[in-house]
């Protein structure tokens, strides 16, 4: 690893560690669930290693991988690494991807029987950079909880290649994926969707 790459990787490691603490403090990555990544260059990505507690990450828990998910210098990356690399390939402007296992995202992915959650008329949708009014309707797709990650990654790729809604996705009974042009933006998008999912679940309870 050359000096410039090492410096950039080290910066992303610190971003991921801080993001892990934030996500854990909100209860969105219990136990060793979830994963976090950040783009280092057009060739490499920094990502959490498999089975690490996101609230207690150390620099040794963050791996450098290529865009095919292969680690550079050893270590076992997250089992869902290909979902991260798929997002980076789909959206070149993305510089961070966050995957959470929160109660709200998990529950809404189960109770919603369609293959998407439709969100509209929420002021907080303006947390996304291309949305400037609450008078909008977006879809967050729900994919089956497929253990064959290459197959799931292909399903995600096929969906977003033709969809105008590019804000995140759910895996049924599993959790949420969001992303952003920076780690800060990815965390903002996560928080916005978490709030809206909580509102949706409360509305469902009122209507039941």
Swiss-Prot record:
Pathway the protein takes part in: Amino-acid biosynthesis; L-methionine biosynthesis via salvage pathway; L-methionine from S-methyl-5-thio-alpha-D-ribose 1-phosphate: step 2/6
EC number annotated for this UniProt entry: 4.2.1.109
GO molecular function terms noted in the UniProt entry: methylthioribulose 1-phosphate dehydratase activity; zinc ion binding
CC terms in the record's Gene Ontology section: cytoplasm
Cofactor notes: Binds 1 zinc ion per subunit.
Entry-linked SUPFAM superfamilies: AraD/HMP-PK domain-like (SSF53639)
GO biological process assignments: L-methionine salvage from methylthioadenosine
Binding, Zn(2+): 99, 101
Chain's role: Catalyzes the dehydration of methylthioribulose-1-phosphate (MTRu-1-P) into 2,3-diketo-5-methylthiopentyl-1-phosphate (DK-MTP-1-P).
Protein's recorded name: Methylthioribulose-1-phosphate dehydratase
Gene transcribed to yield this protein: mtnB
């Amino acid at each position: 690893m050359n000096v410039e790459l090492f410096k950039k990787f080290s910066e992303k490691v610190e971003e991921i560690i801080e993001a892990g603490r934030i996500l854990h403090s909100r209860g969105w990555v219990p136990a060793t669930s979830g994963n976090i990544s950040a783009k280092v260059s057009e060739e490499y990505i920094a990502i959490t290693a498999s089975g690490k507690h996101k609230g207690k990450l150390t620099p040794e828990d963050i791996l450098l991988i290529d865009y095919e998910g292969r680690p550079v210098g050893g270590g076992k990356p997250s089992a869902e690494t290909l979902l991260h690399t798929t997002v980076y390939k789909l959206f070149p402007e993305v510089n961070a991807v966050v995957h959470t296992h929160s109660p709200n995202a998990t529950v809404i992915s189960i109770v919603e029987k369609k293959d998407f959650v439709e969100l509209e008329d929420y002021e907080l949708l303006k947390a996304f950079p291309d949305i400037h009014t609450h008078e909008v309707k977006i879809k967050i797709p729900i994919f089956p909880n497929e253990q064959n990650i290459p197959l799931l990654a292909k399903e995600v790729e096929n969906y977003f290649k033709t969809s105008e809604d590019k804000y995140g996705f759910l895996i049924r009974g599993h959790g949420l994926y969001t992303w952003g042009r920076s780690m800060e933006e990815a965390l903002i998008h996560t928080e916005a969707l978490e709030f809206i999912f909580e509102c949706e679940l409360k509305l469902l309870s009122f209507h039941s």
